[in-house]
């Protein structure tokens, strides 16, 4: 137990931040699972693209609020995007080196 008022306030603030950060992290997990579910259900292209856009917004919001690290956010977005592209069969062909 904190002995000073300021220490009590810091405990309250840290608990509030923890709850908020966990909420952001929970939303990221939920949207990721929803994308996986839609892929397994053979969802339409439009539906998946809207869901992907929504997931990017959620991840960026969590990043901007400091709930997740910027590298984690970038990695998560990249993995989700690759997963959706692979499902849709839109993988870009590997570029061949230019012969000079």
UniProtKB/Swiss-Prot annotation:
Presence of the UniProt keyword rRNA-binding in the record: yes
Region Disordered, annotated ranges: 1-26
GO cellular component term of the entry, any: cytosol
SUPFAM superfamilies hit by this protein: Ribosomal protein S20
Biased composition (Basic and acidic residues): 1-18
Record-linked InterPro entries: Ribosomal_bS20, Ribosomal_bS20_sf
MF-aspect GO terms: small ribosomal subunit rRNA binding; structural constituent of ribosome
Key words, A-Z: Ribonucleoprotein, Ribosomal protein, RNA-binding, rRNA-binding
Any matching Pfam family: Ribosomal_S20p
One GO-annotated biological process of the protein: translation
Entry superkingdom: Bacteria
Function: Binds directly to 16S ribosomal RNA.
Similarity section: Belongs to the bacterial ribosomal protein bS20 family.
Protein name as it appears in the record: Small ribosomal subunit protein bS20
